[in-house]
């Protein structure tokens, strides 16, 4: 007999990562309402993380301090790693989830598509030709580092494509919003397959 959704354990996690370069704590509730408490020291990055919370309906608390006197690379990458670990821990055995999710999100002239698979196999394919190298104090190249860190530790396959865009802020925002929407879709429970692992292998 399938397990009612109400009896599924809370999908929450808290992960701390401390290195010589960064100190990061991430708390997630995959069945939240989109609340966020974010402090990474990089304003635009906080703005993008807020998109993940709001559009993914994930409660997200991220507190990070890093060697920003050098640049944002270690902070952004390590937040991706820690968030990936937290999501992997919170999602558990993946029973009953839809597994796959995709979303298209526009913002004015920009349009991005994100497709995700909770496959258990880390893989990132990202094609985002940013029109500017910097977005505020955020190095646009670090978007790739964030998603690579997430993918490697959430054990997901992720395809990200910016299909149109002339403004780098708009490009990034559509990418993060589409990621959030795809994540939300993949993590939703399928009422017709509760208690089942969504794979013919019987494991993910």
From Swiss-Prot:
Gene3D superfamilies: Imidazole glycerol phosphate dehydratase, domain 1 (3.30.230.40). One of its GO terms (biological process) is L-histidine biosynthetic process. The keyword Cytoplasm applies. One of its GO terms (cellular component) is cytoplasm. One of its GO terms (molecular function) is imidazoleglycerol-phosphate dehydratase activity. It is found in: Cytoplasm. Its EC number is 4.2.1.19. Pathway: Amino-acid biosynthesis; L-histidine biosynthesis; L-histidine from 5-phospho-alpha-D-ribose 1-diphosphate: step 6/9. Keywords: Amino-acid biosynthesis, Cytoplasm, Histidine biosynthesis, Lyase. It catalyses: D-erythro-1-(imidazol-4-yl)glycerol 3-phosphate = 3-(imidazol-4-yl)-2-oxopropyl phosphate + H2O. Disulfide bonds: none annotated. Belongs to the imidazoleglycerol-phosphate dehydratase family. This is Imidazoleglycerol-phosphate dehydratase. It comes from Albidiferax ferrireducens (strain ATCC BAA-621 / DSM 15236 / T118). The gene is hisB.
